[in-house]
């Protein structure tokens, strides 16, 4: 499984049978994703203070477009690579939607439903 962070309202606009097309798809040609061990990295860097986020749990075998593991932008100092989805994300590829917010003391952590995967 791979994960994607987005606004709850953005995901709600994607009806069943629809496709999620964030701005990054037009801007850079792919949808930024993470895995269970790295979702906190982009969240901490880009989404501090946001209270409207969800974490999409995606089955990469159901996306129907290439998924490539590549360097982030900028590249992570430890060489961490991230999954990038090269096309729109079908609603049917999302197997879970989880509220995602900062924990007390700051920073993001996986929701408890995902923490032990």
Place the predicted regions along the sequence by residue.
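Conserved, structured core segments of small domains
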Residues: 1-117
């Amino acid at each position: 499984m791979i994960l994607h962070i987005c606004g709850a309202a953005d995901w709600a606009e994607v009806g069943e049978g629809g496709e999620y097309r964030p701005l990054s798809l037009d801007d850079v040609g792919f949808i930024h994703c993470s895995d269970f061990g790295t979702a906190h990295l982009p969240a901490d860097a880009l989404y501090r203070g946001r209270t409207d986020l969800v974490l999409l749990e995606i089955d990469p075998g159901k996306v129907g477009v290439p998924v490539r593991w590549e360097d982030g932008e900028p590249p992570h100092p430890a060489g961490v690579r991230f999954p990038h989805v090269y096309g729109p994300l079908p609603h049917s590829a999302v197997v879970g939607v989880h509220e995602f917010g900062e924990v007390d003391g700051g920073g993001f952590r996986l929701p408890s439903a995902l923490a032990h995967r």
